[in-house]
Amino acid sequence: MGYGRSAGFGEIKMKVITVAAAIILNAQQQLLVVRKHHTACFMQVGGKLEPNELPEATMLREIQEEIGCEARIEKFIGRFETMAANEPDHQLVSYVYFVELNEQPHIDAEIAEMKWIDLDDTDTRLAPLTKEVAIPWVKKYLAEAVV
């Protein structure tokens, strides 16, 4: 007599967090990253979507809340899936935008640290989205801009 296997048995279902995230560069072609209070990894400015909020609106709201700036979305980069940096066993679904700031950023809201990093930075502990999506996109963007 065999044992039946119910659907989903043995599968691990990850929780999903949906966010909007910004790629912001300065004149020195450095990437802006922030670290929120009580977290270890630096990441893109951004945050979770509110109910019925479009990712573009989330992006502009989070930029204002986290770094106190007005901004303009230059380009939608894409929708990406990575592991969440600070929530174990969570998948991050990110709507990523290339953004231009209208003023100098400063720490606000839940941000503990903010810094501009070089694209080859190996000293800063970075979130998966920053390592796997943001930095490769910026390198490609800058290489194409030179041509």
Report the location of each language-model feature.
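Short connector loops at helix/strand junctions that flank enzyme active sites
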Residues: 17, 44, 71, 92-94
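NUDIX/MutT-family hydrolases
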Residues: 96-98, 106-139
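Conserved Nudix-box catalytic region and its N-terminal flanking loop in Nudix hydrolases
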Residues: 26, 30-65, 69
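Active-site-adjacent beta-strand/loop module that shapes the phosphate/pyrophosphate-binding cleft
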Residues: 81-105, 137
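A short coil-to-beta-strand element that immediately follows conserved catalytic motifs
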Residues: 69-79
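Conserved hydrophobic "DFG−1" position in protein kinase catalytic cores
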Residues: 24-25, 33, 99, 116
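N-terminal amphipathic/basic-hydrophobic helices that include classical n-h-c signal peptides
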Residues: 1-13
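Conserved N-terminal beta-strand and adjoining loop/helix that marks the start
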Residues: 10-31, 48
